[in-house]
Amino acid sequence: FRRMLFRSVNHKRVQRVMNQLELFGKRPKEKYHSYKGDVGKVADNIINRNFSTEKPLQKWTTDVSQFNLSWGKCYISPILDMNTNEIISYNLSTSPNMEQIKDMLNKAFERFPSVQGLVMHSDQGWQYQHAFYRNELQKHGIIQSMSRKGNCYDNCIMETFFGRLKNEMFYGFEKDYPSFEAFSKAIAEYIDYYNNSRIQAKTKWMPPSKFREASMMEG
């Protein structure tokens, strides 16, 4: 909103005001690491940090992120379109397993069954080396791409989404989610808000879903 209003605030002033008000920045907590060595086929890094696209449904990216709550851990596995920043599909689970990945893919292909030539990017997590995942991509004509090992910048577009998600509805609000059901409902509401209401500079100040619709009408 500062960009929309053409306002700028020096970071030192922000830090000074935060100190005066005894406020602290939100810091990421324990991170989920899915890499377990070479347990399957490792694909080439086709994306190679080139996240630019001409239209929707050209490049997707996926990853898994962990949430720590009082009652246990939770994992979200979304697919994000690099053109629109839209969350194409997601699965929320208490366990990062292949059932989560299968559900995420099924939901994505139900929405968009014709995605031949699309590039799907991920890290080298065991899920993405798994034969089922690779076969599903191949069956739908999708080209698989993987980040280099241990290099989060190769998938920074998804890391940015995870940071935004956690800062806007999780950090500082953990006590608002006393159960998996409550947290799942909150995640669903946030994804709906993010896709259909939350404007972004990248999408010409439109929500991701509206930007996709406008882009596909132009095409």
Predicted features by range, described:
Residues 3, 14, 18, 47, ...:
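Mobile genetic element proteins and their domesticated derivatives, centered on retroelements
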Residues 27-32, 120-124, 138-157, 173-178:
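RNase H-like polynucleotidyl transferase catalytic core
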Residues 2-55, 151, 207-216:
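Basic, flexible linker segments flanking DNA-binding modules
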Residues 6-7, 52-53, 69-70, 124, ...:
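Conserved, non-catalytic sequence blocks in retroelement Pol enzymes and Pol-derived host proteins
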